[in-house]
Structures are given as C-alpha cells and as structure tokens.
Amino acid sequence: MKNERELLMLFYDSDNFREVLRQPFLNDGKVCATDGHILIRIDSSLCEGSYDEKPGGLTPPRTASVVPTATTDITVTRQQIERALEQAPEERNRQCPECKGSGDVTWEYRDRHYNTHMMEETCPVCDGSGTVDDYTVIKYQFIVCGKALGYHAVKTLLAAMSWLYIDTIRLVNADAQPMLFKPENMDVEILLMPQIKDEKLDTVKVI
C-alpha cells in the first residue's frame, strides 16, 4: 500500500484535543488512525511507512477493544453512498452565526445593585462585517441498517473506498457501536460510531 498516510489522514485530526490522536500509531500490529468517532485499522504489513506504538511518548488506546465480532455480511456500494450524499448536499452559509449578519451583538451586565445594563457592540466574531468564512450547515443524518451516521462519517467512508479503489465494502456488524466495515480480501477495518437520532434533522437512507 503506497502513500497510505493519505488514507490515514481521512480519519484523524491534527488539532484533536487528545494529543495522542493527532497522528497515526501502531497498535497490536495494526496501523491505526482515529478522531475518536471514526477509526481505521490497517495491517502493518500492508503499509510502507513506519509508525510508533507510543507516538510522542504517549500511550494510545487499544483499538482492538472496540472492534466488534462479525455477525452479518451486508454489501454496501459506492453508488448507494453517492446517491445518499447527493440527496443531502452540504449547505454553505457566510452569515455570521453570532450576530445573524447584523454586525452587532448585545450584551448585558448586572451591577452590584442588581440593575441590568444593556450595551450594543461590534460583533467580535466577524468584526462587524456580518459575514464569516464559509462553514457547513448540517441538516441530515444517514440511516444505515436502522442506525444514524453523521455526514462526516459517511463522506469519510466514501473517500476511503475511493482511495482503496473499491466499489463495494462489507458491513460485518451493524448492531454494535461502532459499526464495522471491511473491504473484501483486504486486511483493513473501518469503524464508524453511530449518532443518537436527532428528530430535528432530516434523514436519508443509505441501505
């Protein structure tokens, strides 16, 4: 597997509040990368790079403890995932979420006599412009075998399949948390943590 770091980068966050999860690590013979919600495990024999069991002297969690036993075998196709994502496009919004585009925010202060004072000031987030850099508005959850997955998890699964040049992936445990996906004839495991179903979000069925 050449340049597997590109694949691993899909699964971890270099700004993660847990320092030990800011880079890939070696764990029980598996090269692992996780942000705490999604996880990939690749047999080290498939990887070109070298990885530490204690990156930066820190001890990562034992990922084997969260890998569920295979209990089913459901094929998920790239086409199914792509179709679901097309039904739930990312929405971009430049309006400042703090001031709602007005450029001003109102704050209050209660003095020692319990009098409340209101003051309108320039919004500190957008500096009064009313706009911010584009951010994603999440309005959807994706249903896989009755479980809800977030947009980022589903998009990462599709990106990993594209990187691995595979059109199908096996869902081998849909009941556990996390859910376990495995490519055919490849010692790779992808685990996605389901979300609590949010009644305020629209749902899109994958399978």
Please place each PLM-identified region on the residue numbering.
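Intrinsically disordered, low-complexity linker/loop segments enriched in Gly/Pro
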Residues: 1-42
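C-terminal functional regions that serve as terminal interaction/effector modules
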Residues: 28, 34-38, 42-207
